[in-house]
């Protein structure tokens, strides 16, 4: 790509910055980052909330190209090939890349929004951005009652982080088990046991109907009840404050803090307004190109071959693939084989590592090999279809995950399944 080609990237997260850095100084790249923070790795926010990492540890490598922080793209004019920004500036492009990411899903719960329909009651938090993380950190003290709504990867991460901060945590999951998308029933049960030992109370098959609130105390009131939010984090006059979560069966969970961890939704507003083709995400082909040949999309906002990944690994792979396309490469993007990894910290050596990939629930006719050690609290399972490894899940001991993932990604025929699950990784 020559320096005359103007590339504008909307989004200063993992995908956008990876692409900009891959293109390098030879390309005239402008990155529009909506957040004012130094770009950060969203994957590490739970560690910041838990108090294990300082926010600056999450910083992403500074891009060589121009990064405009705190600038929001408000309109894409495809005819004039320009992006209009909220500060009144206009960024012309030859190639536009949408790396707008995703938003936290706000479920349709009774009482969730203030009367204006936009603001959440004080004490109710999403957990998606650094601002969300900082607001939660300010609100949580030992003894604070926290309810996490959602038992997927995000909800589990938030629950253990809050428990590490000394909060009294309840996790409400509508499904039958935790992390249903990644874990089988046995692995999920082990995860639930570990979280319980960290102090998290778990409710599965539990549908939340609404949040309960009360009018905030007058600003002149000097007292703050024990375990409340940090000074300066009080609700504004007239704003309501959360007091609990109401379940569909009528049961009520008392809460000082409620965390919404109900998944994410691709941010497609700009693309939709520009007339690009949208389904779940912004539709892209094998060159990550949208329905407009001058516009590409990568990361959480992109939908490729019917799949919206919403994972860091896929965002990075798509950024690398697009960088190759824009610099003259011809290898198509064929999708990402996503591997999920998570470490749940505990006291002393009581942490739990888990990894999952591919299809962890077997189909009829599949072969399954399991190794479980209740004493060591380890669990390993692989699913084989025909002569191919199609998925696996590991908890407690991940020394073999590299060899398993390579076999899975390469489509190799595993010759000795038991050996592949042992500590030497099959070598």
Please place each PLM-identified region on the residue numbering:
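Beta1-alpha1 glycine-rich phosphate/pyrophosphate-binding loop at the start
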Residues: 2-67, 161-182
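FAD-site-proximal beta/loop scaffold in flavoenzymes
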Residues: 119-141, 219, 231, 235-246, ...
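Rossmann-like NAD(P)H-binding beta-loop-alpha module
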Residues: 135-183
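Mid-to-C-terminal Rossmann-like scaffold of FAD/NAD(P)H-dependent oxidoreductases
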Residues: 3, 12, 301-398
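C-terminal catalytic lobe of FAD-dependent flavoproteins
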Residues: 251-275, 350-427
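A Rossmann-like FAD-binding core segment of flavoenzymes
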Residues: 67-84, 91, 165-284
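FAD-binding core/adjacent interface of flavoenzyme oxidoreductases
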Residues: 2-7, 60-145, 219-230, 246-248, ...
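Glycine-rich Rossmann-fold phosphate-binding loop(s) that bind the pyrophosphate
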Residues: 11-14, 128, 149-153
